[in-house]
Amino acid sequence: TATHLLHCALHQVVSPDAAQQGSFVSEDRLRFDFNSSAVSPDQLRLIEEKVNGWIEESLPVHCTERAYADVKGNAAIAQFFGDKYGDVVRVVQVGGCRDGLDGVSMEFCGGTHIANTKNIGLFKIKSEGAIASGVRRIEAMTGDAALEMIRQHVVAKSLEIAKAVEKIKEVNYELADMGLEQVLSLIH
């Protein structure tokens, strides 16, 4: 479900033409390949904000089977035209009414999904980069794994700050031991 939300956010933030090229999904992480030019740090931040906003909204996730002929022309439903579809397709809709085809995200999908976006917990992008010409990859964490990734980042930054403070103290001691003439000679 987080992959569907990411795909929807990419359409809104990067380009409506950003189409899925492949994916890997597990319980607490995902990899999403899509066609696009580079994604800026500001765009990545907006994508995270959108996905986490939909998670916070506690949107229901509906999986319904529909006649392919009835939905194949619906531009609001993400369809992968290289794929072959049978007479009946499964539409996964995040948000909206069960039978309304009015969700935040709607895609043909046969995968496993949660019942509500709140079950994702948290979405955090781990990395984004090129994997081929015109193809980008986003790797992201969800739930407790996302929280752990953030915790590790905070710990690493705290250690960097502590080292910088120690270096400043050392320089202050060195300057205190120097005479005014020596300090001025360092400046000039």
Where are the model-predicted features located?
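Generic, well-ordered alpha-helical scaffold segments in large soluble proteins
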Residues: 5-13, 46-57, 141, 145, ...
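Non-catalytic interaction/regulatory segments
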Residues: 34-131
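Active/ligand-binding-proximal structured segments within catalytic/core domains
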Residues: 1-34, 135
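Ordered, soluble secondary-structure elements with a strong preference for glycine-centered loop motifs
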Residues: 1, 38-45, 148-155
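Histidine-centered divalent metal-coordination motifs
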Residues: 4-7, 113, 188
